[in-house]
UniProtKB/Swiss-Prot annotation:
Reactions this protein catalyses: 2 (2E,6E,10E)-geranylgeranyl diphosphate = 15-cis-phytoene + 2 diphosphate
The protein, known as: Phytoene synthase 1, chloroplastic
Organism: Solanum lycopersicum
Gene this protein is translated from: PSY1
Family annotation (InterPro entries): Isoprenoid_synthase_dom_sf, Squ/phyt_synthse, Squalene/phytoene_synthase_CS, Trans_IPPS_bact-type, Trans_IPPS_HH
First and last residues of the transit peptide: 1-129
Length: 412
């Protein structure tokens, strides 16, 4: 199941060539050895000055679930996720109260033959250029500091996704994900393991990025290992938050909120969350056939039953009137999340709006393509053609030029 790696990633940008994890799974090789054989040291990077994360206390959305004596939840997934949103917004607001300026620290030398941290960021940029072409193009309009930080986050998200969705996914165990999370803790505490971790460690020391969304994304990978069905949309929403909504929360501190924006910080975070959810719902609707061939159904079981459908109908891959009616409702829901996301994109800093608008406009067009395919997402994979991208991207750029609203009911 593909996940929305970043709320700024556009569809159809992932190369069909060599797997990303073929080149980074060991952490000390960045591309295949014939191209970059000895660029990176095998030594562990140790760097001081890292910040502590949540006073060493781990927290996950799952741990916030309140249960009755009968074991039933008393909070919806949206309520639980909103608690995380408030925490991320509070972190950014603390920085905004002190200064609106980004303090850029000098490059920190990395042991080994790589030399400078800036080279590690450059490697992250090469990955983005190879695997997310439209996204990488959009980042060129961002300030150098924000661009490098987004590259670093993109690479970490991609590595995390490849753990359960890459060629070695069958060998990944919960214990392996636990080790990956421990390594994440080291990154946030200034003890990166390799050059890619080093870029992320520097990023989180320069921007008010909290560790929680990263932990929650790993929790989403755990969910993929143990779960292949979702009883209702509440369960599916939580999964979408874990694997995609988290990326929006990671990205807002990097993208930045426009100084002239009158929107609340929470509303901007909610929009980022909504875009992640919308992108992931779109992935799910696009990949129904592909997921079914892997024995997975990422659709609410109760809604399938209400439509007179079952897993067997999905595995059979027949487009019926019942399926069309069901899909129309699912697409309508995804578009509602895109509509919610639009409310916050304009409030971002001017240099950061275009890649986000590009993601929103292009991903939403995938839903149009599903409709154009007569809802056959069993054997046809909806995608946005190059010609349609060329038409859509100028529209996204024009939208990015629109300044934040002049009035709002709440101040940041």
């Amino acid at each position: 199941m593909s996940v929305a790696l970043l709320w700024v990633v556009s569809p159809c940008d992932v190369s069909n060539g060599t797997s990303f994890m073929e080149s980074v799974r060991e952490g000390n090789r960045f591309f295949d050895s014939s191209r970059h054989r000895n660029l990176v040291s095998n030594e562990r990077i140790n760097r001081g000055g890292g910040k502590q994360t949540n006073n060493g206390r781990k927290f996950s959305v799952r741990s916030a679930i309140l249960a009755t004596p009968s074991g039933e939840r008393t909070m919806t997934s949206e309520q639980m996720v909103y608690d995380v949103v408030l925490r991320q917004a509070a972190l950014v607001k603390r920085q905004l109260r002190s200064t609106n300026e980004l303090e850029v620290k000098p490059d920190i030398p990395i042991p080994g033959n790589l030399g400078l941290l800036s080279e590690a960021y450059d490697r992250c940029g090469e990955v983005c250029a190879e695997y997310a072409k439209t996204f990488n193009l959009g980042t060129m309009l961002m300030t150098p500091e924000r661009r490098r930080a987004i590259w670093a986050i993109y690479v970490w998200c991609r590595r995390t996704d490849e753990l359960v969705d890459g060629p070695n996914a069958s060998y990944i165990t919960p214990a392996a994900l636990d080790r990956w999370e421990n390594r994440l803790e080291d990154v946030f505490n200034g003890r990166p393991f390799d050059m890619l971790d080093g870029a992320l460690s520097d990023t989180v020391s320069n921007f008010p990025v909290d560790i929680q969304p990263f932990r929650d994304m790993i929790e989403g990978m755990r969910m993929d290992l143990r779960k292949s069905r979702y009883k209702n949309f509440d369960e599916l929403y939580l999964y979408c938050y874990y694997v995609a909504g988290t990326v929006g929360l990671m990205s807002v501190p990097i993208m930045g909120i426009a100084p002239e924006s009158k929107a609340t910080t929470e509303s901007v975070y909610n929009a980022a969350l909504a875009l992640g959810i919308a992108n992931q719902l779109t992935n799910i609707l696009r990949d129904v056939g592909e997921d079914a061939r892997r024995g997975r159904v990422y659709l609410p079981q109760d809604e399938l039953a209400q439509a007179g459908l079952s897993d067997e109908d999905i595995f059979a891959g027949r487009v019926t009137d019942k399926w069309r009616i069901f899909m129309k409702k699912q697409i309508h829901r995804a578009r509602k999340f895109f509509d919610e996301a639009e409310k916050g994109v304009t409030e971002l800093s001017s240099a950061s709006r275009f890649p986000v608008w590009a993601s929103l406009v292009l991903y939403r067009k995938i839903l149009d393509e599903i409709e154009a395919n007569d809802y056959n997402n069993f054997t046809k994979r909806a995608y946005v053609s190059k010609s349609k991208k060329l038409i859509a991207l100028p529209i996204a750029y024009a939208k990015s030029l629109v300044p934040p609203t002049k009035t709002a009911s709440l101040q940041r």
